[in-house]
Curated annotation (Swiss-Prot):
Keyword set includes Lyase: yes
Name of the protein this chain belongs to: Delta(6)-protoilludene synthase HETIRDRAFT_454193
Organism of this sequence: Heterobasidion irregulare (strain TC 32-1)
Lineage of the species this protein comes from: Eukaryota, Fungi, Dikarya, Basidiomycota, Agaricomycotina
Annotated site (Plays a critical role in the stabilization of intermediate cation): 81
Binding site for Mg(2+) 3: 220, 224, 228
Family, similarity comment: Belongs to the terpene synthase family.
Entry text on domains: The DDXXD motif is important for the catalytic activity, presumably through binding to Mg(2+).
Length: 345
């Protein structure tokens, strides 16, 4: 009899309900066509990639964004997963080369990319060339700084994978806070804002940011674990790490995640009530920014079940029952998402 996995409902009491940006259908068409134009994946993998619908993730994550800012969000989500899919099957030195290309493209968005270069360079350049047309200077500065940190963490993840290195919980959290790509995503919450460094760097804002990131990566890991273990790429997943460190099984690891998530939620709500005041117009911008953090947690969870990324067409059903069947090992070296049991690796 096939083994069943229970996925805890970590957001049962989360006070942010899901909201979808009304520009989603139009912007999805634009961003999806833009990404497909690069031919980054085989036709089969491109079809699977389209079914993941990362534009839906952006539209849940930025429900109040103007059309042009939602386009930046959609393009970014698609860029993230181009980077992920190529780096997931590459050695650390190749991933470092990809990271260097991405950062050069971000810092020089108007400079043509070299002929024959890895496709991620031009995807990055075009994304950023369009985004900066409507992005505030502060959001641009923070985006580039946080994206640099993100790309280097992806290199570290590749090195860990190459050496079959399974981290302990503490060091995993430190690395995962960057590999999930949340910090650059938060910079897009600021596209219309002009928040000074002293505000973003305030301890309470920083605490809220880290707590949000930790809830995001825990939610992502419990949703993606089944596919990642089937792919043989689960060493960078909290379920595997908790099983290894706590000497427990999948059910025990999921229970640990659920309990830890509840503690993160409690701390987030406490810090949310302690937001400092700077006066207007900063206070209104901070309120929107922090509300955006809370919404991101819900957006990630909603997309995980509504899209076909992790559960195929069974997502809404699994969102209610919380039970999934453990998938068999299906190791693949192909670039791009693969279909396994109607879900997408």
């Amino acid at each position: 009899m096939a083994q069943k996995i229970y996925i805890p409902d970590t957001l049962a009491n989360w006070k942010w309900p899901p909201h979808l940006n009304p520009h989603y259908p139009e912007v999805k068409r634009e961003s999806a066509a833009w990404l497909a134009s690069f031919g980054a994946f085989s036709p089969k993998a491109q079809d699977a990639f389209d079914r993941c619908d990362f534009n839906l993730l952006a539209s849940f994550a930025y429900p109040l964004a103007k059309k042009e800012h939602l386009r930046s969000g959609c393009d970014l989500m698609n860029l993230f997963f181009v980077i992920d899919e190529y780096s997931d099957v590459a050695e650390a030195d190749e991933v470092q080369r990809q990271a260097d290309i991405v950062m050069d493209a971000l810092r020089n968005p108007h400079k043509p990319r070299p002929k024959g270069e890895w496709v991620g360079g031009e995807v990055t350049r075009q994304f950023w060339e369009l985004a900066i047309k409507t992005a505030s200077p502060q959001s641009q500065k923070r985006f580039i700084a946080t994206f640099d940190t993100y790309t280097q963490s992806v290199v570290q993840q590749a090195a860990d994978r190459t050496h079959s290195y399974i981290r302990d919980i503490k060091s995993y959290f430190e690395v995962r806070r960057n590999t999930i790509g949340a910090k650059p995503s938060f910079a897009l919450l600021e596209l219309e804002m002009d928040l000074p460094d002293k505000v973003i760097e305030h301890p309470i804002i920083q605490d809220l940011s880290i707590l949000t990131i930790d809830m995001l990566h825990l939610g992502n890991d419990i949703a993606s674990y089944n596919l990642e273990q089937a792919r043989g790429d689960d060493s960078h997943n909290i379920v595997t790490i908790a099983m290894n460190q706590l000497k427990t099984d999948v059910a025990g690891a999921m229970k640990w995640v659920d309990n830890h998530h509840k503690e993160l939620e409690r701390k987030f709500n406490e810090s949310f009530e302690k937001l400092p005041k700077w006066g207007e117009p900063i206070d209104s911008q901070v309120a929107r920014y922090v509300d955006g953090l809370g919404n991101w947690v819900r957006a990630n969870d909603q997309w995980s079940f509504v899209s076909e990324r992790y559960f195929g067409k069974k997502g809404p059903e699994i969102m209610k029952s919380r039970w999934v069947t453990l998938l068999p090992k299906e190791r693949t070296e192909d670039i791009g998402p693969q279909v396994v049991d109607d879900s997408l690796l």
